[in-house]
Amino acid sequence: MELAIPYKYNLHRQYLYSQLPGIPDPLAFYKDCLLLVSWRRQLMAGLANERGDYGGKITWFVVMSCMMAAVGGILFGYDIGISGGVSSMESFLKKFFPSVYTKMENDTKISNYCKFDSQLLTVFTSSLYAAGIVASFFASSITRSYGRKPTILAGGISFLVGSAIGGAALDVYMLIIARLLLGIGVGFANQSIPLYLSEMAPMNYRGAFNTGYQVTLDLGILFAGLVNYGSQKIKSGWGWRLSLALAAAPAFVLTLGALFLPDTPNSLIQRTNDQEKAKVMLQKIRGTIDVQEELDDIIEASRASTVNENSFKEIPRWKYRPQLVMAIALPFFQQLTGINVIGFYAPILFRTLGFAESASLLSTVLSGVVGTASTVIAMLVVDKFGRRALFMFGGIQMLVSQLIIGIILALHLKDHGDLEKGYAYFVLVLVYIFAAGFGLSWGPLGWLVPSEIFQMEIRSAGMSIFVAVSFFFTFAVAQTFLAMLCSFKSGIFFFFGGWVALMTAFVYWLLPETGNIPIEKMDQIWKDHWFWSKFVVD
């Protein structure tokens, strides 16, 4: 097989699909993963010339703007990490969920896998995502009509209020109200921030900039783990209040910073059609006066979008079918990797394996370190190696680690008694390997790819659908995991492993490469794809 292929998508399609008509055996699949990196560089070099390389450079202005916006990732990550930590604190369980605490401490007959099975406890975790589903659709209208900046600001304010109520909670009802407000904040932030980052970033560095959102999300999880580890040592039992209330710190930074964020040139053209103002902003963020080609593409995309004012009515059309499928499939698969199970319930999971409260929280901190480090690596290499290569390498890594964890637990963790220390630490290492695989692939890319595939006329609707689907399945997984763990026991890891295998095959066959392609010319990848070209016509 020759690696040097012409820079044409029809030959790209022939290479990938005509010569591989069936499902590949494992050796061929792995070989193609390795080949992908080599020929992608050649392919993308030609595509950059065909589709427009706007030039420009990374400026401090765009770096600081994107860093401020990406603080929203810390909010989301902190919430993911904090809920599982406080749910394993004895003082928190005694006050709000006494039945769970009694079952954990005194019921010797209950299975290891069922100690934390409580619908009320899962509502505490999952209610945030129910609110986020609704909020994401309201956020779409605000983003389209008023710009990305007001949506980010509204998300910060909602999160700030929710954090204060959570830290001051006196009963379960106050906890749930706080979680609902946090969900509104996260829904607004997740709908607008990835869009903001994609539109502000230079084309050749869009992957790195947008992956920064996942980096800050992982930093939020890590920060939450450190806070939980420290606050559970407070003897008087109010450490959980500190854990919940400290979410106000990044919320305050985001709210204050959003006041000074510039709007993107894309949003300025879409809302006001002020071409001169958009050109000045584009020159400022690109660090060059030669921005006319990029500006013309933005204007052309905006004109197409004004023909169809209601993007939610437009997105079901056949010509947008690939983007709609990805807006649903990518967040669906992302949640079924099982990563949020680790994020939400890692301390509970580690306690199930036999670790003490303090040790389980420390193990969660280390998991956060691994996740953050792997996401930083992804940020550095995603624009060089491409999205598809990282998706597949990370998918294989997650699949193998989950299968081995499932086998160990099936053989050595029974309904009663702790897992032997040697096996427990081995499972811990495998959890870290799984977290690293996610950090290289579905973590950052699950947010990056959806943020860059939508044409301007459907962009806000597409991101709203993506965020809503993400929240829906996050809610579903969070709400059902403890019951599934009780029912499936070790089989829960085979369940998620099967989904990882399916999603890796989905990426291999149906997701085209999106790297190094101007965001306003992304529609071409579907026209040149072996399958999606059947739906997309000029």
Where in the sequence are the language-model features?
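Alpha-helical transmembrane bundle of multi-pass membrane proteins
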Residues: E2-G22, F29-R286, D290, D296-D538
